[in-house]
């Protein structure tokens, strides 16, 4: 199955972007080539930009506190697996503690490091990080991979609490969904929300339907899923076929 997700609000959109960026950073940081570590570093800049646009730390703490308060009464329910519940609550409490220990905003790392600031200002220019532009960065790229990796990990460390908080919130949200099999008749599907509020829409497609691409949109009244296909030039074109898929609507 291939999964497509659509956020209903800006807060979840920001968390999904951070999740994707942290995954990308982890992948390229695990590689050894200097070019791959360059991608890891520019991804770190993107994370700082996304996380610094709002008071993300406060939002995550509030949401985690809300989830902890919602789960705590379940400890009195004998039908609940108490060991699993304690593990979830413990993870939430650990995430809250890590976020509370984080000092300053995400962008402070960049503001306090002139060397990183110089790379960031050149990285937004196409080809702006060549050796004649940033000789010190060029020299750093020739250091052993282990040294470069240690440096990037040091710069990433202040942001790890944001990653943990983001991971917990998104996992809890995805687990709080209602799913059902539906069919996009003539390549299009719409559903009234009947006043219900959701935060995330998921569309699961069978691997055999990989050629069909869902374009999703929603407002507080209705959601739409319209399928397209790419032609030889990869331009999207409408689909007239009936396409089955699994629709999941998630909300805390």
From Swiss-Prot:
Q: Which Pfam families match?
A: ZapD (PF07072)
**Alphabetical UniProt keywords:** Cell cycle, Cell division, Cytoplasm, Septation
Q: Which residues cross the membrane?
A: none
Cellular-component GO terms for this entry: cell division site; cytoplasm
* Any one Gene Ontology BP term: FtsZ-dependent cytokinesis
Q: Where in the cell is it found?
A: Cytoplasm
What is the top-level taxon of the source organism?
Bacteria
SUPFAM superfamilies, alphabetized:
YacF-like
Task: List the cysteine pairs that form cystine.
Answer: none
Q: Give the record's family classification.
A: Belongs to the ZapD family.
What does the subunit section of this Swiss-Prot or TrEMBL entry state? Interacts with FtsZ.
Could you tell me what this protein does? Answer: Cell division factor that enhances FtsZ-ring assembly. Directly interacts with FtsZ and promotes bundling of FtsZ protofilaments, with a reduction in FtsZ GTPase activity.
**Would you tell me the protein name for this molecule?**
Cell division protein ZapD
């Amino acid at each position: 199955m291939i999964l497509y997700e659509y956020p209903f609000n800006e807060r979840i959109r920001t968390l999904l972007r951070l999740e994707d960026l942290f995954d990308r950073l982890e992948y390229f940081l695990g590689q050894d080539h200097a070019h791959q570590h360059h991608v890891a570093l520019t991804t770190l800049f993107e994370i700082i930009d996304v996380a610094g646009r709002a008071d993300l730390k406060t939002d995550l703490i509030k949401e985690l506190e809300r989830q902890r308060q919602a789960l705590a009464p379940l400890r009195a329910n004998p039908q609940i697996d108490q060991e699993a519940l304690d593990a979830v609550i413990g993870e939430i409490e650990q995430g809250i503690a890590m976020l509370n220990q984080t000092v300053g905003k995400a962008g402070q790392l960049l503001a306090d490091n002139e060397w990183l600031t110089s790379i960031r200002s050149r990285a937004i220019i196409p080809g702006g990080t060549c050796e004649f532009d940033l000789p010190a960065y060029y020299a750093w790229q020739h250091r052993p991979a282990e040294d470069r990796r240690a440096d990037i990990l040091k710069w990433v460390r202040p942001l790890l609490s944001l990653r943990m908080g983001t991971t917990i919130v998104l996992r809890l949200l995805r687990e709080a969904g209602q799913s059902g099999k539906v069919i996009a008749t003539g390549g299009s599907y719409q559903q009234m929300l009947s006043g219900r509020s959701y935060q995330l829409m998921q569309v699961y497609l069978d691997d055999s339907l990989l050629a069909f691409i869902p374009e999703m949109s929603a407002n507080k009244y209705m959601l739409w899923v319209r399928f397209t296909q790419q032609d030889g030039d990869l331009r999207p074109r409408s689909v007239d076929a009936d396409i089955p898929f699994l629709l999941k609507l998630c909300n805390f």
